[in-house]
Amino acid sequence: MKLGIVGLPNVGKSTLFNAITNAGAESANYPFCTIEPNVGVVAVPDARLDKLAEMYQPDKKTPAVIEFVDIAGLVKGASQGAGLGNKFLENIRRTDAIVHVVRCFDDENIMHVVADASQNVPVDPLGDIETIDLELIMADLEMVNRRVEKATKAAKGDKKFLHEAEVFKALAAHLDSGKSARTFACDKDDRAIVETADLLSLKPIIYAANMGEDGFAHYEDNAYFRSVRDLAAREGAQVLPICAKLEQDIAELDDPEERAMFLADLGIEKSGLDRLIQCSYDLLGLISFLTYGKDECRAWTIKKGTKAPQAAGKIHSDIERGFIRAETINFDEMMACGGSVAAAKEKGLLRSEGKEYVVKDGDMIYFRFNV
């Protein structure tokens, strides 16, 4: 899974990326300090995997991972190439989802950049969101208009392309009204047509409302946050309250107990990274299954609804091709039996599942195959 972190200059985007990945991306009070996208691979925290590793003492413990990409800040006019627009838009296209960092704090020492590097205006999270949304929409409109032309031309030789042309014409009108592809209403078949265009404004989005340290524990009182939350609710998007500076402080604490105490003192249950990862999984409809043994304990990420052979294919294509069965027990069932697979087997909880089995979150699986 690859998440692109985007935002206008000076909203705290690179500070958040630094905290998440400890990659040390340059962060400064001027636009475009991130010119090439910085990439960081982050392990997905999973207490179930930790427990299995404690039980089996494997040679290797391998968590699931998320790739975060810190994409250069953009300004108004990016879809026409302003600022670092074209590079920015192409980098977004390579991601699975967008984390849009939105400034929800006041600080007179950090200028709020909108139209160009010299302009400093009052903080306006909804205006910032609109600026980036419009750039994505305008880039998509250009792409969709090309698809209309292509489908219309193809329909002269094959009438099946007529419907495709009509779908893209309707989508073009939707985009031209300033609305994102995410909000385009259509049925499942037409959605499949739309998805072939690889549109930027169709990508799932999380608004990361970046607030100051003061009062973060009571983020609901932040008027900027509330405005972003209400917008996300109307769009059906996700919103995540976060404080990038606090996340940076947390990232510098190596001791897990020290981190827990730091969070408790702030009245925060989970770090922003943990909440962002969970939010990302929910947004993209992802779950994890586990493989276990003396050689390796590992977490694997799959889409909800994935059947056993396709889950096996995540490990190796030969296992999917030669799939026989999946010996399965859910982690919670195993723990209810005293943390013993043998005890769970005695109780008949270790199941032999076939090709139609839909893998569940937390399933511990041993795949039988023959090639």
Please describe what each predicted stretch is.
Residues 2-6, 11, 17, 145, ...:
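C-terminal-of-GTPase-core extension/linker across diverse P-loop GTPases
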Residues 89-102, 136, 208-209, 297, ...:
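Long, contiguous hydrophobic alpha-helical segments, chiefly transmembrane helices and signal peptides
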Residues 24-32, 39-41, 49, 63, ...:
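Generic secondary-structure boundary/loop-capping signal
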Residues 1-120, 126, 133, 144-145, ...:
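Conserved G1/Walker A P-loop phosphate-binding module
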